[in-house]
Structure formats: C-alpha cells, structure tokens
C-alpha cells in the first residue's frame, strides 16, 4: 500500500497458493483457518476474519476468502476441469491445511499437549492444544489446527544446517549419520 499504491488499489482477491488451486479446481474462493492463521488477518481464537486487522491493513472482507475448517468440502470439480483430468465432476475439493498443520495431522500430533519437531529448511516446534492459548513471551504463534483445535508453533530458518554445525563444531565429526544411529535405534519398534 505504501510502496506500490497503484497495485494495492487493484487487489481484488487475496489467496494463498493452495487456495488458488482450490479456486481453479472448483471455482470456490476459500481458505482454511489453519493456513489463514498465518495471514495476520484472522481472529484465531474465534476462527473468523478480524475486523480490527482488516481496518489496520485497509483490507475489505470481500477481498478475503470464505473460511472453512481443513476437512470441509468447499465444492466439486468444475465440469471442464473434470473432463480435462478424466475425473468425475463429483470429485470433492476440500479446504486443505497449512503445511505444518497438515504434517502434524500426518504424524498424529492432534492430542492435547502433543508435540512435533521437524527439521528441514526451517525448524518447527508444534504443540497441539484443545484450547486457544497465547504464549506470553511471544516466542510461539497461536494458530488454528487442522483438526478443529488449536496449536502453538515456533519456527526458525536454516534449522537442518544446525545439525551440520553441531556435528562438526561440537562433536568434531563429519559423519553425522553415524552420530545419529543410536538415536534412530531408540525410535525402532514404536518405542
């Protein structure tokens, strides 16, 4: 708005990448609350767009997608899409979820207090909660979870590269795989 006011004035709709795919597949202008939680425009606790944040950001509600829970059906394939893909037009399109919320569901991190830590390009700690909560130290973000509950999440960049640093600088080895072998054994047989 400040740097490119002409472009800001032309914004008709605001979508996240997965939501654009849902739009192209079904024609539904929508998002899910887990992904919308990271847009700074969502009242996470109440799972609705925040009037206060829309006013601060000068965004109108009609520019924002309709909100769904992650598992909710948002539509079916448009006939021309179904024909092009060779699918039935009855194929349902669901709202989906943000990447970390979807990963948490996939790893079973859905119970109250369960924690998931992932290391990759970023490092993420994800704590599921049946109730909305706010970290008073502002170290963790409050989000809607894909299973209808909430979660606290913290992220940092370059997380997996920390493993390399740890192995080389602290453990004085370049064989990170050998260093991790005893840890891997702890996870065998569902232990």
Question: How should each PLM-predicted stretch be described?
Answer:
Residues 1-29, 40-51, 55-56, 79-191:
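Active-site core segments that coordinate phosphate-bearing ligands/cofactors
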Residues 32-36:
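Nucleotide/phosphate-binding loop and acidic/charged catalytic motifs
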Residues 37-41, 62-72, 152:
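A glycine-/small-polar-enriched, mobile loop at the entrance of the PLP active site in fold-type I
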Residues 59:
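Active-site-proximal cap/lid insertion segments
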Residues 69-77, 97:
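Glycine-rich phosphate-binding loops at beta-strand->alpha-helix junctions
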């Amino acid at each position: 708005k400040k740097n490119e006011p002409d472009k800001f004035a032309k914004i008709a709709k605001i979508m996240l990448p997965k939501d654009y795919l849902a739009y192209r597949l079904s024609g539904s202008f929508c998002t899910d609350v887990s992904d919308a939680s990271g847009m700074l425009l969502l009242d996470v606790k109440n799972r609705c767009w925040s009037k206060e944040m829309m006013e601060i950001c000068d965004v109108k509600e009609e520019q924002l997608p309709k909100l769904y829970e992650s598992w909710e059906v948002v539509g079916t394939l448009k006939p021309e899409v179904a024909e092009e893909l060779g699918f039935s037009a009855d194929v349902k399109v669901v709202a989906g979820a943000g990447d970390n919320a979807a990963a948490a569901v996939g790893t079973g991190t859905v119970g109250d207090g369960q924690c998931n830590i992932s290391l990759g390009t970023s490092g993420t700690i994800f704590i599921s909660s049946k109730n909305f909560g706010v970290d008073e130290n502002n170290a963790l973000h409050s989000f809607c979870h894909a299973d209808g509950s909430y979660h606290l999440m913290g992220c940092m960049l370059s997380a997996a590269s920390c493993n390399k640093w740890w192995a080389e600088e602290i453990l004085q080895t370049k064989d990170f795989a050998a260093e991790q072998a005893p840890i891997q054994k702890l996870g065998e047989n569902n232990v």
